[in-house]
Amino acid sequence: MTGLNQRVNELQAEMKALGLDGFIVTNPSNLLYLSQFDGLDGDGCLVITPQQVTLITDARYQEALEASLPKTVNLEITRDYYDVAHQVLADRGYQRVGFETSASYALYRKLAALFGDKLVPETGVIEKLREVKDTNEVAILRRSTQLASKGFEALMSYAKVGVTERQVSNWLNNWMLEHGAQKPSFDTIVASGFRSALPHGSATDKQLAEGEVVTVDFGYYVDGYTSDVTRTFALGDPGAELRKVYATVHEAQERMFQVIKPGANGQQVDSAGRDYIADEGYGKYYNHGSGHGIGLDIHEGPNFGPRWRSNVITENNVMTVEP
């Protein structure tokens, strides 16, 4: 549990910098990150203080948690998660308690009733820590992405003229689950022909046709971490114009790869691809971002886009690059 202790220590350091003497964690991915227990699904919360860590949940998870939690984490079993969280912090004479602004409004009202004006909204504190992956996280993400690549290679034997987009999506889903993936991180996108221009084109009953390009965008969890892979291929000869579009996007991606390094920001990475695509005459069609971090969630930081100058790349970020 060395990784767990380091993560908690990093959060406690951030709390000190923010002047917080407590932090209530409710976001499911952040709970998993800080507890390393993949089973709560949002049922409970973590209370972090400078001196201790308390996991509050109910009896459904008690046996599994008692067998896996390190001794440094206190376990409280109750259905009144937030009343107990308040008591844990009250015992320590809290003054400023952070909570995640991603919490629902109903949860915010509950916390506000308990903590009053001592409740401090904080955005992205834990998410920022999650952007920098440790060695184990990088290894898992590599396995996750390698499995996705194998899945796409296998799909090529099935994705033929006459098969529908939905059938392609279902085939890939079955293959991924049968070969070790836990679940998809989003509904697999299969968009063929004119629909391949849609950034988020859900699979339909449209049949794949000769001469069309097909875009497949998918991600699957392995050991809690998700891949995010987009591949485009042609059925037969798509024609000169589509070959040019494909080559343009590929070159844009290569130019973005050259920019990505510690210290570069999301706007710089985006511009490396976006400017090239515009120079080739396709700029007006570039209506989406250029990439993002991946990890416990399909969308994490850092982000690549015209508005993301503040997102600076650091060592051990893991990112998609998708112009």
Set out the residue ranges of the language-model regions.
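Active-site neighborhoods and metal-handling regions in enzymes and metal-associated proteins
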Residues: 1-323
